């Protein structure tokens, strides 16, 4: 297994799909990385040479991925909560942040139903 950005990339998958196993890299970014390195998107990771894998590593290193990206997102949410914005309050209360209705639905965000105590 090739190791890129601290993640074991699956050998049996095509390069584009394998790169998406890194947090912060989706299909579009993976296609861009493959295009910049000259690696065909259809080739499997196991068929790549060590030089090509090193080029992929260098390209991925230019993006904010994995731990750094997770930390950045967490700090952004924490900042919203600290300055008291509406979005921050919704995060703090565990409710939908982007304007979805909460009278019905929103169960994923609110969690399981709590019985009404009489």
Swiss-Prot record:
Keywords, ordered alphabetically: Ribonucleoprotein, Ribosomal protein, RNA-binding, rRNA-binding, tRNA-binding
Cited InterPro entries: Rbsml_uS13_C, Ribosomal_uS13, Ribosomal_uS13-like_H2TH, Ribosomal_uS13_bac-type, Ribosomal_uS13_CS
GO biological process: translation
Annotated Pfam families: Ribosomal_S13
Region (Disordered): 91-118
CC annotations in GO: cytosol; small ribosomal subunit
Keyword Ribosomal protein recorded: yes
This protein's record includes keyword Nucleotide-binding: no
A Gene Ontology molecular function term of the record: tRNA binding
SUPFAM superfamilies membership: S13-like H2TH domain
Subunit structure: Part of the 30S ribosomal subunit. Forms a loose heterodimer with protein S19. Forms two bridges to the 50S subunit in the 70S ribosome.
Family: Belongs to the universal ribosomal protein uS13 family.
Matching HAMAP family: Ribosomal_uS13
Role played: Located at the top of the head of the 30S subunit, it contacts several helices of the 16S rRNA. In the 70S ribosome it contacts the 23S rRNA (bridge B1a) and protein L5 of the 50S subunit (bridge B1b), connecting the 2 subunits; these bridges are implicated in subunit movement. Contacts the tRNAs in the A and P-sites.
PANTHER family in UniProt: 30S RIBOSOMAL PROTEIN S13/40S RIBOSOMAL PROTEIN S18, SMALL RIBOSOMAL SUBUNIT PROTEIN US13M
Name listed for the protein in its UniProt record: Small ribosomal subunit protein uS13
């Amino acid at each position: 297994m090739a190791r890129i950005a601290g993640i074991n990339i699956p050998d049996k998958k095509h390069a584009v799909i394998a790169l998406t196993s890194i947090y912060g890299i989706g299909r579009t970014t993976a296609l861009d990385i493959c295009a910049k390195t000259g690696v065909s998107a259809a080739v499997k990771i196991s068929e790549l040479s060590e030089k090509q894998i090193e080029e992929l590593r260098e390209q991925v290193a230019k993006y904010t991925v994995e731990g750094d990206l997770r930390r950045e997102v967490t700090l952004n949410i924490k900042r919203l909560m600290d300055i008291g914005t509406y979005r921050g309050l919704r995060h703090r209360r565990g409710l939908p942040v982007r304007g979805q209705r909460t009278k019905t639905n929103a169960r994923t965000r609110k969690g399981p139903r709590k019985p009404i105590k009489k």
